[in-house]
């Protein structure tokens, strides 16, 4: 009986230590899971377009990160702060060419908003609230997101 309790406790410790690392969501090694998605911070700066292409190559369904709630934003900002110091990070929001609508790089409509100002490609910071825009050609770090 004591051995069964010991083994059960050991399995519980392993499960709890893996929670939040993406293991429970079946994320690839080095990726972190939240709400049915996997996330990874990349610290090699790229232009917005190059970062989006890079994310698409990483996993099936991969794109630059899109935010759909303040809780998801908080999760990603915490993930970034564990990896990088204060940096500009691209996210998947840009002005859809020849349209007046903003859209996420994964095709989702923009519903949740946190604008600080307006322009073409959008970034966020791990230390400043709100979204900001800048020329898409400029380099920035980025976070990729994919379905779990």
Curated annotation (Swiss-Prot):
Region forming the signal peptide: 1-24
Disulphide-bonded residues: 27-38, 55-144, 121-136
Keyword Secreted annotated: yes
Residues in C-type lectin domain copies: 34-145
Quaternary assembly: Heterodimer; disulfide-linked.
Functional summary from the UniProt entry: Interferes with one step of hemostasis (modulation of platelet aggregation, or coagulation cascade, for example).
Protein's UniProt name: Snaclec B2
Species whose genome carries this gene: Macrovipera lebetinus (Levantine viper)
Classification of source organism: Eukaryota, Metazoa, Chordata, Craniata, Vertebrata
């Amino acid at each position: 009986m004591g051995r069964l309790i010991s083994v059960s406790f050991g399995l519980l410790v392993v499960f709890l230590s893996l929670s939040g690392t993406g293991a429970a969501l079946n994320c690839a090694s080095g990726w972190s899971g939240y709400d049915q998605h996997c996330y990874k911070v990349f610290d090699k700066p790229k232009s917005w377009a190059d970062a989006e292409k890079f994310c698409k190559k990483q996993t099936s369904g991969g794109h630059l990160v899109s935010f759909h709630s303040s809780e998801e934003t908080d999760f990603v900002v915490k993930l970034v702060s564990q990896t990088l110091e204060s940096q500009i990070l691209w996210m998947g929001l840009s002005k859809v060419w020849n349209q007046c609508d903003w859209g996420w790089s994964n095709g989702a409509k923009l519903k949740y908003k946190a604008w600080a100002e307006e322009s073409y490609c959008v970034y966020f910071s791990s230390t400043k609230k709100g979204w900001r825009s800048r020329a898409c050609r400029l380099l920035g770090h980025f976070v990729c997101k994919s379905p779990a």
